[in-house]
Amino acid sequence: MDGREYWDRQAATYDRATAWLEPRLLAPARQWVAQRVRGRTLDVAVGTGANLSYLRSRADELVVTDQSEAMLARARDRAAAQGLAITAVQADAARLPWPDAHFDTVVCTLALCCVPDEVAVLAEMRRVTRPGGLVLVADHVESSTVLGRAVQRGLDVLGRRHGEHHRRRPLLRLGQAGLVPVEHDSSRYRLVERVAAQHAS
């Protein structure tokens, strides 16, 4: 089963599956990202659209993309329920269909853990962000605790079939994608890390 098929199957139950984590761990990361959004904004790997309620008051124009059409359908429904105008485009995060420097802000939350090549996606995010714009990332990353890392190693084994990686650290890969961090922080025990970055040159 490829990634697109897997996420198509997960779309109907994803929000229920993450309902416990959402207010405790995920929503604070979404809020941190949204507070830094400005201008024309792209949400990469939007999933079911959980970011939309946070982004709606910050972005002048909101474009969303996901490889999964089923996930995009959920995001469209959520936007419609909120009276929010979005442009939704099915696309591979590593091959975004927009020209260079097209967006003021590009966002990816809780999805770099699920892509085959996180550096390729970060590089694409950089490419479509204008110089001086922001690339904003939030994701679950390698924990700062021994117990946390042990649990994550087990989750990596379980998630191998559908390409989940619980111990990546996008912050440490920014340079390979032509980005430099301008701000970052993390949740308790570094379960989720939040990063704002700009073009390195």
Enumerate the predicted regions with their spans.
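N-terminal, positively charged/glycine-rich alpha-helical extensions of SAM-dependent methyltransferases
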Residues: 1-12
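C-terminal alpha-helical "lid/dimerization" subdomain adjacent to the S-adenosyl-L-methionine
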Residues: 17-21, 136-194
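A short acidic, Gly/Pro-enriched loop at the edge of an enzyme's catalytic core
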Residues: 94-106
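A short SAM/SAH-binding and catalytic strip from SAM-dependent methyltransferases
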Residues: 105-117
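C-terminal lobe and adjacent flexible extensions of AdoMet/dcAdoMet transferase-like proteins
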Residues: 195-201
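Conserved alpha-helix/loop element of class I SAM-dependent methyltransferases that forms part
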Residues: 20-40
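A short glycine-rich, Lys/Arg-flanked "PGG" loop and its adjoining helix->strand segment in the class I
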Residues: 119-131
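Class I SAM-dependent methyltransferase SAM/SAH-binding core
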Residues: 42-95
